[in-house]
Amino acid sequence: MKFHLTPLQIEKRATIQRLTAQENRVDIPSRFKITKEQLASLEGEICGKVVWPWSPGYDADKKSFNDVFPANPFVIVYAACYQDIRICLEFAKVNQLQIALRSGAHSFADYSVCDGMVIDVSSLKSIYVDPANYTVWVEAGTSFADLNPALEFYGMHLPGGGCPTVCVAGYMQGGGYGLTSRNFGIHSDCVQEFTMMLADGRLVVANPDQNTDLFWAVRGGTGGNFGVLLSVKYKIFPLGLIWGLQITWDFENDPTNAAKALYAIQENYLTGYKHPKLGIETLLFTDIATDNHRKVLFGAGFIGTEAELNSVIAALMAIPGATIRLKKQGKYSDVNNWVLEGIPDVPPDVKFYGRSTYISKSLSIADYVAILNFFKTAPNSYSMVDMEGYGGEINRYPENRSSFIHRKATMDFFCLLFFDKASNDQEKNRLWMIQFFNFMSRYSNGHSYQNYPNRDQVGFQWAYWGPYYKQLVVTKNKYNPDNVFAYQQAIGGSLEPDQEKEQIMLFDNKPVVYESY
């Protein structure tokens, strides 16, 4: 019977023939004790695309969003179904391969790639919207570029990230801050249930009533710790058009007015439950596109009328030097791009270092002047600081209800330092980042946002999870006892003795509830 093969099936046949032919010249690195027959078997069993070091496009496939810490995977598997993931886990176990899990490849510290096996779930991106029950079910590889329009068709919304190519798997497991989080909560707060495949291939469903410790841990405990996230069910919210806003203050020659603006933003919006319908990201950047001056940019998304917006921002507009750069109404996905895209205006193919710290106390105008002056010493004009505004629904969510514990902060203060071959200052950027955050320690509450990991972060266990870290270790040992998913900042390291004393345990050790399929 005549039948047609897909292009991928044709490619797979050619790969298997190459691996099994007597004259094949595939070189397997000596550190891997794997036969060519095993590779051919894996290629044949996997439904999705398998990329080997000799495959066309390998160099592009192995790269992450940032690629500061490049890896050379032995194999990359684009899972086309859940069985592909199960096969990969067994293959990695038998052949003692390190595993990295990847969805959107947006890990700041490149933790979604390794020199062993990369399991990529970006092809798993089904979406089912149930507007009548205010829920959406998505697979782990779904990007916000796909999810936002699917929700907007029904006039619905889920808080999401600033970059549309981010996928829900990594984003949700680190918490997930977005422009509407002050009104609707952190992304992981909206999770009602998820399905995960554990390292032994078994499936678990976690929600407030089943596997409750895992439900708590995954929502903030970061990816690559407990298992492979397969799908998530979220609560969603009605949302129509919103306003996008940008106001700038120049501090190239005098930081006074810009510092007053930062202080006003803090006092008027970020302390207490003030104006939650105003989402805030305040940036320090160099305006390369216009006058090359350093500026403060108040970026915002507002849910309400123009008159209400004008009333809310009146205090900011009264500060000398305030310049409206954008004021426009549109869909959330458009506003999100308008407010954040292109700041700073960096060339293509740049790399970056990123790091964050949380601020809980009110800073003075003099404090902000000092921060602005330090920012002026950044290595190049691509550098930026983003002060993500907290408060509102973010801080109303109980601290112990998920492992995203940062509920007392006024802002997440994070820095991105970009560099490329032309700037030729990678190490200078890395060292300046350390100096900057040593300076910022006087203002910090000692914690950092786990979705912005930095490999130079000392004491990340306390910085990301504070007094709940030990509960995360216990939960990981329960669901991933062999520590199959491991990387530099994976859960499992020890705390300082004084931090150990402050640890809070939340759950009894109930048995794992497995699914029957």
Regions found by a protein language model. Name each.
Residues 1-517:
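Soluble FAD-dependent oxygen oxidases
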